[in-house]
């Protein structure tokens, strides 16, 4: 390769695969300019089509797709500016070659071969412009149609979620109302039991008085009294057993109400997140309020900033089973436990726990 070829290759270097001029002539220069402009337009058209394809692959994330499209268009605009600057530089060199050739030819008008080449170049340029404009209009129409379909699908999904949340809330209200009725019946039974115990105590007092009289009687009366006392002790044992069972029932009912409080708070948070509102504090599985020393959780970023120790304390408090060897799921499990299940929360990417914690 000659030194002149190396100089031309270095001067007209490009990343579009367009072959530099073979010689310093107006014909070769115009051939290179025509090929370079066509390749640049194809490159820009390919970038816009890629942006539309990225938009179609992310139908469920409208905001992210629009951001991707905006970035792609910005890159296309930057590339367009770069290619325009390069094209201006190349055109200046080719025009200089043309002025040199016109000076050498010293003719009043361009030669026939030049007019013929210019006519073919203008015709090809107009065809490329029309084709590029048509493809761009088609891409715009297709992108607009896809965006309308995304909006309709997102609106439909949101209505379905609202209906489902409303149904779950009504079911929880009905279950809570039923539990309150059961608690009311249990309290009534406890009142009756207390009344019976008061009557039993009165009878016991009367029985003790009679026992004092019976002690003054014969040994036979003592034996009969011992038998009666044994029977009474059996009755007391049975009453204590019943009382223990009632305490167990009360404990089970308390745990059930605590679980319902946690579920109601979590469902309320799910509804609040659907309207992009911060959540409220969810009581623990046993009904206790989270430790005031623990960081408050009102949004998905609060969970991401938790330390490993605080995250495990929250998971244990809500009764969530977790794998100690797989810490990547801890924050996602905690987000579901407190009701952070909106589309933004589900798409949020958690950072790993810091090794210094």
Swiss-Prot record:
Q: Return one Gene Ontology term, BP aspect.
A: meiotic cell cycle
InterPro entries for the chain:
Mug135-like_C (IPR013902)
GO annotations of cellular component type? nucleoplasm
Q: What is its main location?
A: nucleus
Q: Which Pfam families match?
A: Mug135_C
Where, subcellularly, is it found? Nucleus
Q: Which UniProt keywords apply?
A: Meiosis, Nucleus
Q: What does this protein do?
A: Has a role in meiosis.
Task: Write out the similarity annotation.
Answer: Belongs to the UPF0612 family.
Record's protein name: Meiotically up-regulated gene 135 protein
Tell me which species this is from.
Answer: Schizosaccharomyces pombe (strain 972 / ATCC 24843)
Q: Gene name on record? A: mug135
